[in-house]
UniProtKB/Swiss-Prot annotation:
It is an enzyme of class 6 (ligase). Mg(2+) binds at residue 425. Binds 2 magnesium ions per tetramer. Its cofactor is Mg(2+). Belongs to the class-II aminoacyl-tRNA synthetase family. Phe-tRNA synthetase alpha subunit type 2 subfamily. This is Phenylalanine--tRNA ligase alpha subunit. L-phenylalanine binds at residues 343, 382-384, 423, 448. Pfam families: tRNA-synt_2d. GO terms for biological process: phenylalanyl-tRNA aminoacylation. Its main location: cytoplasm. The gene is pheS. GO terms for cellular component: cytoplasm.
Length: 500
C-alpha cells in the first residue's frame, strides 16, 4: 500500500499510542494540525486508522460576564447600597451602576422583592424590603461563580443549576460547540506499522536548486493522485443563452447572411403589419394578440411613395391581386407598439434596398401577450430572415429550415405542416421533436406575397422565416423549461453546458 511521508509518520506515532487525542497526536508527530488531519483522513480512507468525533455544547463567560465575576452582578451592587442607606434615589444608584444597567436593575429589584419603589418629591425612591435584607445566593450567582472558575463548562452541567438561556438573555454567558477528536489505529494499520515503514522525506516541488546540485537524483518526489476529489472551480463564462445567441449569429454570418440591425424595440403598425400586407381589420392586430403603447400613441409614416403603394395593395391590390377591399387608414398605421415579430425588420430592409441575390437575418426581442409556462414567454427572441433571388422556390425554403433545426438546434426529427400567414403564400409551420416535451413548434415561414414585395420595390421571389430561437435553445442547452434561459439560478448558470 502506498503511503505518503506524512501518512507513514502519523501511522508510526499512532502505533505507539494505539489511541490518542488529536492534539496529542499532533504534538507527537511534530507536524501542524492541517497536515495531521489530512494524513488521518487518508489513513482512515485506507482502513488503517479511525477518527472519532464527539461534539458538545459548552457555555463560557462573555466579556460582560467576566466583568460581573470581578465586580459583582448589578443587583448585588445596588442591594449593597440599599442595605447601607435603607432608602436611595436613582442618582444614588448611578454611583455603582452604569446607565445601561440602571433601568433593568430597578425592575429586577422589585421583581425579586428586594426593594419597594415609590415617588417622593417627584423623584423615584427605592426602599429596601425584609427580603432584600435577607437575600441570599441564587442559582444565577452560583452559575456565575462556577463559570468564573473554569474556562468552559458543558451546557448540561450548567443547566443543573440554571437554564443557559437565562444567562444568555442577560449577556453573562454565550454558547459554543466544541468537538473532541480521538484517533485510533486499526488492526490493519497496526500490522502494517509493525512490519516497518521506511521514513524518507518527500519533495513536492522540483526547484532550480535541486536540478543544479543534482540532488533531484537522490530525493524521493511526492506522488500526486490525479484522481483525488478536488473542489470544483467555476470560472467566469458567458450567460449560456447569450453565448448560444452569439454563436447563432456567427454561424449565420459564416453562411453568407447579412445582419439587419435596428436600435428601437418600438415599431409603428405600418412596419409591423401594413407593409407586410396584413389588413387593418385582422384579429392579430387586436389587444389580445399584440401590445399597444399608451404614450406616445402614434409615430411617423415613411416616404409618401412607399405609403401610397402599400395603401394601393391593401385597397385595390397589386400584381394581379384584388387587395383586401377596404379603406386603408394612415392613422391606424401610425399607432406605436412593441415589435410583435422580427418580420417587421425584413419589410424595412426590403424597402431600404437589398442585394439580389442576397441573404439577410436579424435576432430581435419581440413581445406578445401569452400565458407564461414552460414553452411560452411574453417577451422572447426571434431569428427572422429572408433570401432574395431570381429562381428561389418553396423547396429551397424547406431545406434552409431543416438545416436550421438539425445543424443549429441539434433536433433529431423535424416536420412541416401547412399554415397560413397574411404576408406569405404558400406558408408552412415547422416543428421539431424534443425528448421531454414532444413536438414543439419553432416558427413559421413561406414565400412573401407579391402584393407585399412589389409594394416594397422588389420584383423577384423572397423566401422568409421567423423562428422562436428560445425554443431552439431549449434543444441545444438540454432544458425543458424556457424560463431557465433568463434565470438567475446560480446553480443552473454554473452547470449549464456550453454549446458547440
Amino acid at each position: 500500500m502506498e503511503l505518503s511521508y506524512q501518512e507513514k509518520l502519523t501511522l508510526i506515532k499512532l502505533n505507539e499510542l494505539k489511541k490518542a487525542k488529536f492534539d496529542e497526536l499532533v504534538e507527537k508527530t511534530g507536524l501542524d494540525q492541517v497536515a495531521v488531519m489530512r494524513a488521518v483522513l487518508w489513513l482512515q480512507s485506507k482502513g488503517l486508522a479511525r477518527l472519532h468525533e464527539k461534539s458538545e455544547r459548552i457555555a463560557k463567560l462573555t466579556e460582560t460576564g467576566k466583568k460581573y465575576a470581578q465586580i459583582g452582578l448589578p443587583e448585588w451592587r445596588a442591594l449593597k447600597v440599599l442595605r447601607k442607606k435603607g432608602k436611595v434615589t436613582l442618582d444614588d444608584l448611578k454611583e455603582v451602576l452604569s446607565e445601561d444597567e440602571l433601568k433593568p436593575i430597578v425592575g429586577l429589584l422589585r421583581k425579586e422583592g428586594w426593594a419597594s419603589i415609590r415617588k417622593e418629591d417627584g423623584k423615584l425612591v427605592l426602599e429596601i424590603t425584609e427580603n432584600g435584607l435577607k437575600a441570599e445566593e441564587r442559582a444565577i450567582d452560583r452559575a456565575l461563580k462556577l463559570l468564573a472558575e473554569k474556562e468552559a463548562i458543558p451546557v448540561s452541567e450548567i443547566e443543573e443549576i440554571i437554564k443557559v438561556n437565562d444567562l444568555k438573555r442577560r449577556k453573562i454567558a454565550e454558547e459554543d460547540i466544541v468537538t473532541e477528536r480521538t484517533v485510533e489505529i486499526t488492526p490493519e494499520g497496526e500490522e502494517l506499522a509493525n512490519k516497518g515503514l521506511e521514513l524518507k522525506e518527500e519533495v513536492s516541488t522540483l526547484t532550480p536548486e535541486l536540478i543544479k546540485s543534482g540532488k533531484w537524483r537522490e530525493v524521493e518526489f511526492k506522488r500526486f493522485n490525479i484522481q483525488a476529489p478536488v473542489r470544483r472551480i467555476y470560472p467566469g463564462k458567458k450567460q449560456p443563452y447569450r453565448a448560444f445567441l452569439d454563436k447563432i449569429r456567427r454561424r449565420l454570418i459564416e453562411m453568407g447572411f447579412i445582419e439587419m440591425t435596428v436600435d428601437s424595440l418600438i415599431e409603428t403598425q405600418f412596419w409591423n403589419f401594413d407593409a407586410l400586407f396584413q389588413p387593418q381589420n385582422h384579429p392579430a392586430r387586436e389587444w389580445t394578440d399584440t401590445y399597444q403603447l399608451k404614450y406616445p400613441k402614434s409615430g411617423y409614416l415613411p416616404n409618401k411613395e412607399l405609403v401610397e403603394r402599400v395603401k394601393t395593395a391593401h385597397e385595390r391590390g397589386l400584381a394581379g391581386s384584388r387587395g383586401w377591399g377596404y379603406v386603408w387608414s394612415p392613422e391606424r398605421a401610425m399607432l406605436l407598439m412593441p415589435r410583435a415579430h422580427g418580420t417587421a425588420l425584413s419589410g424595412r430592409q426590403l424597402a431600404k434596398g437589398v442585394e439580389i441575390p442576397g441573404k439577410y437575418f436579424t435576432i430581435q426581442r419581440v413581445f406578445r401577450p401569452d400565458v407564461l409556462d414552460r414553452t411560452h414567454l411574453i417577451e422572447f427572441n426571434q431569428v427572422d430572415g429572408f433570401v432574395v433571388g431570381e429562381d428561389l422556390n418553396f423547396r429551397h425554403l424547406l431545406g434552409i429550415l431543416k438545416r436550421f433545426a438539425v445543424e443549429i438546434a441539434g433536433a433529431k426529427k423535424v416536420k412541416f405542416l401547412p399554415d397560413y400567414y397574411p404576408f406569405t403564400e404558400p406558408s408552412v409551420q415547422m416543428s421539431a421533436y424534443h425528448p421531454e416535451l414532444g413536438w414543439v413548434e419553432f416558427g413559421g415561414a413561406g414565400i412573401f406575397r407579391e402584393e407585399m414585395t412589389r409594394a416594397l420595390g422588389i420584383d423577384v421571389p423572397v423566401i422568409a422565416w421567423g423562428i422562436g430561437i428560445d425554443r431552439l435553445a431549449m434543444f441545444k442547452l438540454g432544458i425543458d423549461d424556457i424560463r431557465y434561459l433568463f434565470s438567475y439560478d446560480l446553480g443552473w448558470l454554473r452547470e449549464a453546458r456550453l454549446v458547440w
